[in-house]
Amino acid sequence: HKTNAYVISNGVNDSFVPPSQPPHNDKFTIVCSGRYSREKAQQQLLKAVAISKHKDEIRVILAGDGPRGSYLKALANRFDIDATFAFFSRDQMVKTLQNADLYVNTAIIEIEAIACMEAICCGAVPVICNSPRSATRFFAIGDNSLYEQYDIEDLASKIDYWFEHPEEKAERSKEYGATRRSFSQRECMEKMEAM
């Protein structure tokens, strides 16, 4: 007996919207959000920033909490990275993503990628881990939005690329913008109701 199968996202809350003005930060601000855990693999970002050509001009915000917090903080200190570790409310997360110059998704295991969808909805250009066990990689547009899993040099080169190409980053944000509507909770609920 055959049936029609549909994959419909849970969607992103409608408060995640692009800022009225692009961010103007004193440092290039990279946001990475998610539980501090092995499968989120945020150490990849810290190690990549440590070898970036622009390390001293970069600020990292690791939004989340979890069992690997102490390890990640120690790593940031060891590499002398300007890093903030915090758990944000929804309103704070929206503001943080709206002010991001880049969003990095380091997860090696991820099913739906709501955090990356939230970043895209806030206008951020993502750089995503190309893990075979993560659905997030399918959001990538273009070569400079994916890096190979655990390849720190590859991630650092993608960070440096976007740091050095702000005009292209603005254009890429517009390309991602075309996908935002499909992530809306309202849109996803309408699809479910239409089934």
Predicted regions and their residues:
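Aromatic "clamp/platform" in nucleotide-sugar-dependent glycosyltransferases that forms part
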Residues: 108
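Short hydrophobic beta-strand element within catalytic cores of glycosyltransferases
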Residues: 125-130
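A charged, aromatic-enriched C-terminal amphipathic alpha-helix characteristic of glycosyltransferases
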Residues: 166-195
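Conserved acidic donor-binding segment of nucleotide-sugar-dependent glycosyltransferases
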Residues: 141-152, 161-166
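Nucleotide-activated donor-binding/catalytic signature segment of Leloir-type glycosyltransferases, i.e.
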Residues: 70-88
